[in-house]
Amino acid sequence: MLPASSKMPHKQPPPPRKQSISMGRGARKRDEDSGTEVGEGTDEWVQSKATVKPPDQLDLTDAELKEEFTRILTANNPHAPQNIVRYSFKEGTYKLIGFVDQLAVHFTQVGNLIPKDSDEGRRQHYRDELAASSQESAKVVISETEILEEEEEPKEVEAGSQTDVPIVEASEKMAEEELMTPKQPKERKLTNKFNFSERASQTFNNPLRDRECQMEPPPRTNFSATANQWEIYDAYMEELEKQEKTKEKEKTKTPVAKKMGKMAMRKMTSMESQSDDITKVTQAAKIVERMVNQNTYDDVAQDFKYYEDAADEYRDQEGTLLPLWKFQNDKAKRLAVTALCWNPKYNDLFAVGHGSYDFMKQSRGMLLLYSMKNPSFPEYIFSSESGIMCLDMHVDHPYLVVVGHYDGNVAIYNLKKPHSQPSFRSSAKSGKHTDPVWQVRWQKDDMDHNLNFFSVSSDGRIVSWTLVKSELVHTDVIKLKVEGSTTEGLEGLQIHTVGCGTAFDFHREIDYLFLVGTEEGKIYKCSKSYSSQFLDTYDAHNMAVDAVSWNPYHTKVFMSCSSDWTVKIWDHTIKTPMFIYDLNSAVGDVAWAPYSSTVFAAVTTNGKTHVFDLSINKYEAICNQPVVAKKKNKLTHVQFNPIHPIIIVGDDRGHVTCLKLSPNLRKMPKEKKGQEVQKGPAVEIAKLDKLLNLVREVKTKT
């Protein structure tokens, strides 16, 4: 047998091509029509052909063809609009848009390529690897099966037994099937980012971050000098001259400075020099302090603005007081609160007078002005040598505060001026009181538009003070003479016993009418026009009268309180009280509510605050709530805020507590079907008159 390779015919080499191989030897011709290069031995299809031109094609001369045109590529889009305007809500006008998007899209095509680093690319690469490995394993299995078949064929022929053939074939088929099915590798499980389970773990502490801000650097100056013995001496001499000049200025400004010692003057000058340095940052520091207090007392501010006691819906004739802020100052520690007054212009600002009611323990006095925006520290601080027993703020000039001292002096403080001394002060020459001043009250200006206020003292004098040319001028309005108490002195002189005035109040409509309460328990109805006699006398209380107050709505009604534990409501045309309330403790102060003619509050020495509403209950208080500890503190004064439903209460330890009235303590008239709710002073007067008429009818019957 011949090998299979000998049967194959031998291939003859191809004949050489009769063409010119060297193209460089043949001359090249340039076709004038087409401009293509043609060799001598090129094929026909390579040769140039005549160009076909359209009949309307423009024919240009050689000069026009050789002319060059420059083209400049710019990034501006010629189709972009140039005059787009948009309306500005901030300025209220149409504004021209200067920047226009110059992007022009010429061609877009959606691709089907996947990045290798993406999740989809990794999955596709993994599937390709699996398919390639499966194909390789299948090829290996097929080659092994072919080898096994070649080896088993001669063995089967030699055996010659036909009975074992089906068994062998069955086993071979089983082996082939096992080998033909490749073992698939386990597919790696891909994580699903959207399938997760919550597990508790320890929280991670947030790292600290530093914040920086750019600011203007402080100005710097270069200073150089020499220090020796005589220069130090000259510097000390200049400082001494400055101190002497400041002392002379203080002496000329205030006569009080004469009594002050050298140590006090040194303290004042040092404080003034320090205050000059920090005046630039006081306003910024005050704003920052208010911001800090706003965050600190945010829960209290929220209660003040929005909280209403929901339990009042289930109790008709009871109310509560919610404690809000507590105002105190270390400088006024253990000084009793002797006076409270709200500012007539700024509803969050109030003044507090500090002194002592114990005549054996008299000390200095303090005038503090607090704001509810900053409960931690007072807005203004003024100190005095004698205790402050009363104060009042001017209605038209809310920056003027008049105070009365325990030593009988009266003074006017101006909040606009930076110094801590009073702008005006009485003296022995100007007719000051000889006993403590218990109450002061601003009045209307006189005919010459001079400021005017009144004061009452234990020396029995009601004095009118007028500010004339930066000087206080006094006029005795009336002397509180006790009737039937005249005694004869030497040479037949009649000596009158003078009553001790403790409180007074002026009528809101009748300008000349006012009431005066005394330590003897009597109340005198007086007139500014008569200085020798009283219009009427009321045997009001068995002990000293602590407060007298006209009703803000009803012109005939006033109220008084005393240390004999009682609060009485009067009609000034009747000498007997309309209502009498026993509070089981000495009453320090009473105040009418500005929003209702029938609501008033009283404070007692056992630490309780009592709130009455005669339209709801004319026999008992609708709120009896302790504000301070009974054994340690005593309440001294109370005042209603003219706008907000809050009151301030002072005690004998120098603390002032702010309390919010619950809805039952400030009920308004209920709406009736088909009728509008009437509001105003006329409604309040009618409401109180209705109660007084019932009492008047009972008294006339008896």
UniProtKB/Swiss-Prot annotation:
Keywords: Cell projection, Cytoplasm, Cytoskeleton, Dynein, Microtubule, Motor protein, Phosphoprotein, Repeat, WD repeat. One of its GO terms (biological process) is outer dynein arm assembly. Coiled coil: none annotated. GO terms for cellular component: microtubule; outer dynein arm. Residues 1-58 are annotated as: Disordered. Its main location: cytoplasm. It comes from the Eukaryota. Consists of at least two heavy chains and a number of intermediate and light chains. Interacts with BICD2. Interacts with CFAP45 and CFAP52. Interacts with CFAP53. This is Dynein axonemal intermediate chain 1. It comes from Bos taurus. The gene is DNAI1.
